[in-house]
Each structure stands twice: as C-alpha cells, then as structure tokens.
Amino acid sequence: MSDATTTRVCPLAERATATQVIEDLAPSPWVVRRCLETGFVFLENPPGYDSLKEELAWQVTYQRESQQRARAEPLRYALSRCLKYLRRSVARRHKVADLTLALAARAAAGRPHDQAVHLVDVGCGSGELLGGLMQRMPAALRQRCKPHGVELSTELARQSVLALAPHGGHCRHATALDGMARFAPASLDVIVLSSFLEHETAPLPLLRHCDAALRPGGFVLVKVPNHASWNRWLRGARWCGYRWPDHVNYFTSTTLRAMAEKAGLEVERMNGRDRFPLSDSLYAVLRKPLRPVAANGA
C-alpha cells in the first residue's frame, strides 16, 4: 500500500484543538482522535486520494473487510447478511432509495413542469442507487429527473456511466470535492451522500460545495454510521462501523447537525427513527434555506 497519508485537525472545528487519542481501536499505523472541544471522532492520518482510486477503492476494501468479518465471526456475519436480504428483497425496504424518491417528488412538485429535476449521488459506486431509482419512478417523474454521479474509483465510475447513460445521466470520475465543484451554482435539487461522508477527509468543505450547488430549498440526504449506537458501545473495536483506513469520520446526531449548520444547511429531518440507538446507521435530510443565511464559521 502507498505510504502517502495526510494529517488532519478536527474536521468539524477546522483548526487545531485539544484532542485525545483513542487507544486500541485502529491497527497501526492509523491514529484515531476525539476532539475535546466538539466531541468529533476522526482518523488523524488517512490515506491520500490517489490510493483511493485503485488499491483502497471501495469495492476492494469492502470485499476485504467482508472476508475478514466472515472469518472472525461466521455466524454473526451470516445472520447480518440474511437480515439485509430480508429487508431489501422480502420487505422491500431500502430507506435511502425511498427517501431519495420522496425528495425528488417534492423537488419536482415545487418547480415548473417543463424544468428538469437534477439528482446527484456522491460516491455513487456502480450507479446502482440512481439507476434503480429511475426505473422505479412514475413515468411523469422519470421524464423530468436527470441522474448524475460522482465517483473516485476508476472501475466503479466506468460502471456508473453505463448505468446512468440510459436515463440521460452521467458519472464524473473525480474526487467528491472536485466533482461537486463542477456543478453550476444553484443547479441541483437533490444530493445523496449515502455511506459516503464517513469516507471524506474534508466533510465540511464538501457540505459547503453541496450548499453552493443546490437550488434554494434543495435537499441533501445523508446516511453515515451511527457512532452513538448501542451496538458500537457493546462491540467496541469490532463494531461494523469501524473500517480502516477508509472510514475517517465518525458522526453522532449532534456532530452531524453541527457540521450541517456550519455549512449553511438546515436539518429538516433527523427524527427518532433516523437516529435510533439500536441502529448502526444515522440518517438526516438537510435542506438549503429558501433565503440565504450566513454560514456559521464559513
């Protein structure tokens, strides 16, 4: 693996603060710190972007992590896989897809019928989310929606282009910051950050880019590992939300709200089900204010 890493201060404070090293959590050489001022937990020395394109690309680390968990706890791993299958295939529950569809419909209802609704999935992988969502949409909504993706992995970006092209969309092979910066100001309606913000070494600048690219009233849907979950307290270093070195930020509802508001976004939804302590996932719907507000600390 490449030796290139970066060194970060607290991503929420964006400056040097007093921190505490969390011992016996990440394997060497990775260092995890908690900011004593904000409570934010982060990887101090994440790998650089170049290694994330290939050797530490999501599909590589996900497969490796899955294999390690299957070997370490085969029964628990098998049960987890079974429950995921039941939720998605039998109960047909996919919270991110369902929320994205609802937000797209809201965005369309608030705009003239002859105007397109632009959706962006940041860290879109193979394009499965928006590609599948376009097929689920009612015809009238599908005709108005334009799906876009941003993906750093070379191979996944190629797959995403193929998935989105039939729906008039495209994937930008770029970092999240560069990809979002290419969108015109106030041009997007819905941005999806599903299982992504925990990977981004500059999460607050990314949210600021999202704010700039959104039309007033536009939405950001966030899903991240829930660092306040009871399972994390129970499992400790074996918690499923810990993945080294590609998970670099660990959010609670408090720190996610603080970061969103610092970026100039409002938290429209983060209800009890979205931050349920028995769930390993934390959800939030952020919204760009209809009237400009001064971003806190921007």
Predicted feature residues:
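A SAM-dependent methyltransferase catalytic signature shared across enzymes that methylate proteins
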Residues: 11-18, 253-270
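A short His-aromatic
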Residues: 195-199
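A short glycine-rich, Lys/Arg-flanked "PGG" loop and its adjoining helix->strand segment in the class I
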Residues: 204-219
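Short N-terminal helix/helix-N-cap motif within the alpha/beta-hydrolase-1
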Residues: 201-205, 232
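Conserved N-terminal segment of class I S-adenosyl-L-methionine
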Residues: 1-194, 204-207, 271-273, 280-285, ...
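Hydrophobic residues in well-ordered beta-strands that form the structural core
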Residues: 44, 222-224
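Short conserved AdoMet
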Residues: 142, 201, 215
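Short, glycine-/aromatic-enriched active-site segment of Class I SAM-dependent methyltransferases
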Residues: 225-249, 254-259
